[in-house]
């Protein structure tokens, strides 16, 4: 008799018949099991049938996937994938429109299954679908529902990666692009057309060229002015794909075209400031657009200044002229010789705060920030001239060594902003932290620089800094900026107000508050008390982590970014013995019941938890593997027999919660950054509560000394 681990108990359904309760021996061939089921209902030709799941996406069961069947699973006896594909192929070409519509509905559903998709594609199903679309002008006006299902099936089939996107014809591309450009088209058709075009652009460089010729900026921007956020999301996703795949020499042209069509202001008014909350996928696409826009600065950021280029040197002359000679040209002054002018220029460049007073062009030879720093300085000097002149003259007139060097500050600040905003980095698959204020101005980076250079000047004065304190000031300014950004101000003015509240004295107060637990609680008695309390705190954190796992979390399925989001959910049983998980149709807003999660893993079967590049799905997905931030959110459960459950957490917080909780289940230490932070916070609070009675009492560093022995013990009385 086979061991219990090879036996799974399932229920198998068939329309119009009572369900069969069956014990499946996983060592038996699947064909033998199907024959037994067919015999139970007296069905001939068992080779025409197969098993599939009754719930969820109703995936077919194959020899490769049968190990996923768990005890208590409900299965269906169904027509085999090859037979179903053949029948649907015939029905999709039926003369009856009702038959074709029903066939397309079923095809759109079954195409998500890779087993069925392989069979259908092997019958040239993709070619049949593309021909239906290519000849579909009449179809669009009368049978838009059928066209929507056709496009859905096509996208599902192509998404499996079985065939290359390069097989798509130019006629098909023109037809899909036509649906996007038509003013009145069914929402479902438009949504799928945008998704198909995005997939083409992302998966084929040759198709990018063709689509870029067919789709205009104006056509895509018009879809951002609708009230349907899903259409807006797909439109921005296609814009991002075109932006991402465009050759470097054409990206700036695309950005200019977007500016001419007022893309930024349309997104601001119709998406960000719309009356609907921003969904996760929209937030991600806005984040991607923000990153790609800032990445346009990378070329200037990595370009060194050529000291021999007169045009570039003229920019530095212009900075000097605006600051000191706005109304006059010293070269025309009577008796002004070359040597005298050079001496005056050197003095002026020193007052401007350049490190190299004789040849300030040398200050811009370091990359980053390269020429981008000079661009920022010129923008400030021309667009915010009063601010520029005030900053320069205010510091150049000081005689007490407390002047803030504008040139050096501007260069270092530009470099800092590039680091904070990760200019030049590719978008992260798992992030959605866009900043609304960057969509409020066409020159957002330059405006941000203008705000921050004023902040730097203000902080310099508050610190009464000298040249030796330059790096300290830059550290404080970085802290001010990074503390202000997470609040996501809606405008640059709000950001400026937030920075104003984060003065140097406030930063000191925050630092002192954050260091209090480290600075104030280092005496031996306090350390001993901390060590006594710490196990209680860690147990409290452990219970919180396990409770969060019992509540569960939703995770996005890998590889579905360019289509409608798909989610799966995982939660721990209340007795902490089983992990339940399963697919979802939508991202849940509340708790998902155990009954709706079809799969489960006994905690006792879990062998290990692996993270990052050790995860199987990170080794398989080369594109994901290259993304450092996705790697930092990836983890996998390894369980018997040689199976894995792969996760990509939505954010760092959820990642830490799950890593801690799973580690606690396995009896291992919780070592995440979140645990350390929670432990320190809770320890600090508990210590303060326990030490309230000792307020204003100095706790000695050492125990009190033992007194000397008395000269005699005559005071001791012995009872007889």
From Swiss-Prot:
Record-annotated ELMO domain positions: 310-484
Gene giving rise to this polypeptide: ELMO2
Disulfide bond sites: none
Protein known as: Engulfment and cell motility protein 2
Subunit structure: Interacts directly with the SH3-domain of DOCK1 via its SH3-binding site. Probably forms a heterotrimeric complex with DOCK1 and RAC1. Interacts with ARHGEF16, DOCK4 and EPHA2; mediates activation of RAC1 by EPHA2. Interacts with ADGRB3. Interacts with AUTS2; the interaction is direct.
Places the protein is found: Cytoplasm; Cytoplasm, Cytosol; Membrane
Motif (SH3-binding): 700-707
PTM annotation (Phosphoserine): residues: 503
Positions of post-translational Phosphotyrosine modification: 48, 717
């Amino acid at each position: 008799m086979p061991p219990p681990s090879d036996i799974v108990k399932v229920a198998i359904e068939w329309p119009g018949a009572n369900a069969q309760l069956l014990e499946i021996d996983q060592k038996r061939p699947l064909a033998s099991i199907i024959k037994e089921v067919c015999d139970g209902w007296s069905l001939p030709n068992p080779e025409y049938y197969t098993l599939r799941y009754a719930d969820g996406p109703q995936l077919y069961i194959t020899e490769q996937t049968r190990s996923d069947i768990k005890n208590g699973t409900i299965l269906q006896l169904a027509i085999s994938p090859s037979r179903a594909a053949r029948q649907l192929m015939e029905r999709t070409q039926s003369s009856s429109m009702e038959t074709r519509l029903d066939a397309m509905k079923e095809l759109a559903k079954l195409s998500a299954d890779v087993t069925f998709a392989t069979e259908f594609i092997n019958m040239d199903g993709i070619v049949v679908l593309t021909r239906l679309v290519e000849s579909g002008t009449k179809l669009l006006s009368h049978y838009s529902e059928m066209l929507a299902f056709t496009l859905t099936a096509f996208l599902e089939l192509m998404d499996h990666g079985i065939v290359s996107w390069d097989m798509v014809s130019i006629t098909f591309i023109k037809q899909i692009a036509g649906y996007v450009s038509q003013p009145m088209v069914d929402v479902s058709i438009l949504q799928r057309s945008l998704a198909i075009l995005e997939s083409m652009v992302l998966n084929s460089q040759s198709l990018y060229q063709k689509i870029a010729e067919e789709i205009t900026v104006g056509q895509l921007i018009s879809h951002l002015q609708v009230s349907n956020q899903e259409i807006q999301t797909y439109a921005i996703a296609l814009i991002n794909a075109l932006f991402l795949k465009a050759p470097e020499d054409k990206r700036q042209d695309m950005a200019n075209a977007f500016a001419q069509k007022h893309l930024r202001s349309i997104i601001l008014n119709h998406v960000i400031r719309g009356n609907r909350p921003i969904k996760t996928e929209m937030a991600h696409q806005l984040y991607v657009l923000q990153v790609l826009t800032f990445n346009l600065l990378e070329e200037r950021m990595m370009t060194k200044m050529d000291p021999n280029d007169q045009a570039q040197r003229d920019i530095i002359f212009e900075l000097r002229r605006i600051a000191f000679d706005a109304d006059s040209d010293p070269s025309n002054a009577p008796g002004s010789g070359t040597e005298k002018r050079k001496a005056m220029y050197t003095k002026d460049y020193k007052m401007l705060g350049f490190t190299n007073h004789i040849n300030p062009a040398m200050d811009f030879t370091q990359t980053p920030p390269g020429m981008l720093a000079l661009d920022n300085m010129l923008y400030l000097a021309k667009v915010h001239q009063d601010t520029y002149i005030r900053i320069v003259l205010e510091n150049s007139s000081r005689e007490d060594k407390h002047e803030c060097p504008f040139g050096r500050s501007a260069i270092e600040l530009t470099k800092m902003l590039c680091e904070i905003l990760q200019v030049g980095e590719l978008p992260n698959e798992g992030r959605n932290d866009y900043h609304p204020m960057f969509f409020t101005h066409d020159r957002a980076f330059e405006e941000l620089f203008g705000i921050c250079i004023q902040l730097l000047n203000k902080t310099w004065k508050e610190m009464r800094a000298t040249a030796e304190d330059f790096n300290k000031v830059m550290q404080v300014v970085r802290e001010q900026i990074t503390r202000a950004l997470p609040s996501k101000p809606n405008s640059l003015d709000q950001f400026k107000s937030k920075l104003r509240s984060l003065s140097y004295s406030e930063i000191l107060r925050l630092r002192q508050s954050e260091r209090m637990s480290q600075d104030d609680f280092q005496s031996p008695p306090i350390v001993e008390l901390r060590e006594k309390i710490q196990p209680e705190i860690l147990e409290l954190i452990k219970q919180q982590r396990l409770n969060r796992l019992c509540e569960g979390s939703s995770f996005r399925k890998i590889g579905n970014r360019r289509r409608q989001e798909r989610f799966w959910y995982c939660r721990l049983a209340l007795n902490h013995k089983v992990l339940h998980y399963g697919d979802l149709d939508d991202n849940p807003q509340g708790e998902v019941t155990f009954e709706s999660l079809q799969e489960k893993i006994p905690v006792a079967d879990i062998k290990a938890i692996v993270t990052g590049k050790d995860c199987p799905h990170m080794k398989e997905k080369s594109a994901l593997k290259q993304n450092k931030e996705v790697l930092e959110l990836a983890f996998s459960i390894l369980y018997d027999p040689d199976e894995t459950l792969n996760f990509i957490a939505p954010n760092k917080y959820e990642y830490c919660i799950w890593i801690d909780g799973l580690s606690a289940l396995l009896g291992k230490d919780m070592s995440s950054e979140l645990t350390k932070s929670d432990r320190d916070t809770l320890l600090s609070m508990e210590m303060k509560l326990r030490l309230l009675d000792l307020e204003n009492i100095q706790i000695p560093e050492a125990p009190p000394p033992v007194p000397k022995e008395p000269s005699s013990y005559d005071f001791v009385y012995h009872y007889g």
